[in-house]
């Protein structure tokens, strides 16, 4: 009996000590000495790439397209997206608030990544520091890109003659989740965008090729500069940026090439294509509204029944003349 009691006491003591250790240093927490490693820097970088995949899919495309009459609602839509289609969006609408929240949550993650990489820098080897310099450059680019995307939805169209008076958006540059930032002007917003692009170009120097570009390259920054210059009415610069990429990324000119691009992800047009695998499909929003179909066993074909289709006026813009 005495041996049994002693064994029980020993087990209870061991269990108590183990529980205490887990309370002090739980297995799911990151230990302070592990937070300043290359692995963690890669982790916060990867988290931002996941955010970007979400922002570049699903409703972030279909809702604005519905609102500006690029898409028409089909009979089988079940009124999905009807408020956008009928121009009945309000500031309290779920689509509007979720877009705002998603953009600024991504900004928070970007600024956290920059702050953490700065804190970890002195603990890294010289080779690791070079990689982190590139990662930080990516973060500066994504900050500029996300704010431009948000401005397209929440600001007036940029007018060079009025930008100093047009309302911009808060442009957070530090990881301060509770900060209350002023909107500023649209001119100031794009000054910040330009400053972040300059920082990105200092370290993101890999040129890129049309195959398997799942991380940011110099060419992707150039492509964004072309889009940005067009938006800012800098037409000569927009043309120059775009022309500098034509030779490396020629447009697909055949039906077979177009099919390979959409079915096999093989194309000469791809400047940057964020990686999505079967195991990471949950990190992107669905494009099912464009692709809904059902299998008809009697006829042996798929019945295509999209929620939306491109408007006739928009299709005419894309057809050869």
Model-assigned labels for residue ranges:
Residues 80-154, 184, 202-205:
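Conserved, well-structured interaction surfaces
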Residues 1-18:
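Sec-dependent bacterial lipoprotein signal peptides
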Residues 123, 127-132, 153-191:
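Short coil/linker segments at helix-helix boundaries
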Residues 20-67, 242, 306-308:
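Membrane-proximal, proline-rich intrinsically disordered regions
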Residues 43, 215, 233, 237-317:
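Hydrophobic-face positions in mid-chain alpha helices that act as interaction patches
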Residues 107-110, 190, 197, 242:
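Inward-facing hydrophobic residues that define packing positions of alpha-helical scaffold repeats
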Residues 128-131, 135, 189, 210-213, ...:
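Structural signature of alpha-solenoid helical repeat junctions
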